Amino acid sequence: AVAVNSPFFPPDLYDADPETVLSDCWMENRVPVFESVLNPDGDPKVTFPEDIDSIDEALQRIADDETVVPTLLERGDRFDDRFEHFRHKHGSFWRWVRPVFDGPTRESANARIEFRPLPCQPTVRDTIALQAVFAGLLESLPRREHPIYNQPWADARENFYAAVRDGLDAELRWITADGTETTDTEELYAELFELARDGLELRGLDAEEANRYIQPLRERVDRRVTPASWKHERVAEAVGRGEPFAQAVWGMQAEYIDKQTETLIEGTFVDWL
């Protein structure tokens, strides 16, 4: 929700009037576009994944997934070439969160989880902030045995699509550390950032370092603004002044690039505000 960054397509792709586009657009269009283009009839391949309870189940999910590009592969010299056809299927196992098993040598063989919906960010520091928050959460949540692990799958799925659709305006369901269910976004984000800070400290950062990494995203929440909402507001204001929709979108994009150029390395997105 704090990272959304793609509310518009190129303006010549729209048939609807500007008011409809502005009211109906998703804040992160990459997710619905990928799903609509690549999902075949029947079981979807690009989707929020079902729960997985074991490594065996994760392996079986990939093995059972519909094959899109059948290929005969020659075995190479890598360790994971022993299961080259299974590894090849990773390339079309399109879940927004997915397991990956590989490794060029036995010593480097690994199982990892890819969290794939994170969009690109306007600056380097914003990108690092997003990675830091996720790294901190992945460290803190299991160590603290946080009750969000008990959230029903249906709620997690709805949270995902609500965040993609509405950004910071999404109504999200959260379970606090004391087990209380809430939709209070102020409480949700406050606890989320504290858990991220805790996780970074558990990995060896001091409190000042951890807070510095997290701060760009914390400020977005405090100011109720994301890159997507910034883009949406710019286009809406231009259309409100009477500009043609296409001119409004291209003008917004030009301003985005100018500000990104000014802040790419040393600044953050909130410096634009």
What are these regions (language model features)?
Residues A1-A111:
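Loop-rich catalytic cores of soluble enzymes, especially ATP-dependent carboxylate-amine ligases
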Residues F9, K89-R95, P99-A111, L118-L273:
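Acidic, glycine-enriched catalytic cores built around paired aspartates
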